[in-house]
From Swiss-Prot:
UniProt protein name: Increased recombination centers protein 6
A GO MF term: protein-macromolecule adaptor activity
Role: Involved in gross chromosomal rearrangements (GCRs) and telomere healing.
Signal peptide: none
Disulfide bonding pattern of the chain: none
Domain of life: Eukaryota
Keywords assigned: Chromosomal rearrangement
Any one of the GO BP annotations: vesicle-mediated transport
Stored Gene3D superfamilies: 3.40.50.11960
One protein family per Pfam: Adaptin_binding
Family: Belongs to the IRC6 family.
Annotated gene: IRC6
């Protein structure tokens, strides 16, 4: 089977291996922590859900090789990385990429650096599109904020970073969290897993669905919904559903039409599962 490819790009100590480990569950990844440079690492993984099976190559790259680089130096190296990435030499890589995760260290990366870096990420996104339609790319981009273990980042700073990322039309994921937020949406580590599992991959093998099991699950879900409607003691959580829909609609405004369609389908599936 032809593998799919995603790229995790970041500076040293920004969470790249943690993300790769989360996606692949590769036991060898912790051993890579001792490797001085992570540029050029490839983690091979297989992903199986109840609907499909696929193979995935997780490409890891660093635009900066020094942990103590200044903001100016890091931006210069990120821009240099982008210039190489958009060149004809890397055309084949751009064609096979299904996703990009850009990692930042929320403890050490300054707000000004993140703001300027996001502008370069926008240029990288454009380089992944078709030449005639700059935004016609079916992949995903997420900005993942990490924090070194046993250290804390202030909530106000995290919100400021998230607002900057969202204003660029990109998704922000805080690697330090997990579970669900108040809108019943996956966040942090669980959102990364969900993002990978729900993506419309280029190469995959669909699994046969047991029609009897499908009908059984559907009837069980319908019965559960009916009980919530007729039983006064059962709460349907309509407020949560409406809140989720409003939040999804606001987020969709920053997406392209193709991205909106995929996002809408994902939200519908989540609401059905929630019910």
């Amino acid at each position: 089977m032809i593998p799919n490819h995603i790229l995790i790009l970041g500076s040293p100590n920004s969470g790249k291996l943690r993300i790769a480990n989360l996606i692949s569950k590769n036991e060898e990844i912790p051993n890579l922590e001792d490797v001085e440079l992570h540029s050029g690492l490839i983690v091979k993984a297989s992903l199986r859900t109840k609907y499909y099976f696929l193979k995935l190559n997780i490409l890891i790259d660093e635009y900066s090789e020094s942990k103590g680089a200044t903001d100016e130096k890091k931006l210069s190296e990120l821009h240099k990385w982008y210039q190489e990435f958009k060149s004809e030499e890397f055309g084949e890589l751009r064609e096979v990429l299904d996703g990009l995760m850009f990692t930042i260290n929320m403890k050490t990366d300054s707000i000004s650096f993140i703001r300027d870096a996001l502008e370069i990420i926008e240029q990288i996104k454009i380089s992944l599109g078709d030449e005639e339609n700059l935004h016609d790319w079916g992949g995903f981009i997420a900005v993942v904020g990490s924090c070194p273990e046993n250290q804390i980042v202030e909530d106000d700073l995290i919100l400021e970073i998230e607002d900057m990322v969202l204003s660029q039309g990109l998704e922000f994921i805080n690697l330090s969290t997990e579970g669900e937020n108040e809108y019943k949406e996956k966040q942090g580590k669980d959102r990364i897993v969900e993002l990978i599992e729900s993506h419309d991959w280029t190469n995959l093998e669909m699994l046969k669905v047991d029609s009897k099991q499908y009908e059984t699950n559907k009837l069980a879900k319908m019965e559960s919904m009916k009980q919530k409607l007729i039983n006064e003691k059962e709460e349907l959580d309509l407020d949560d559903i409406f809140s989720k829909l409003n939040l999804a609609r606001d987020h969709a405004q920053s997406l392209t039409q193709d991205e909106r369609d995929k996002y809408a389908n994902k939200v519908i599936e989540e609401i059905i599962d929630f019910l």
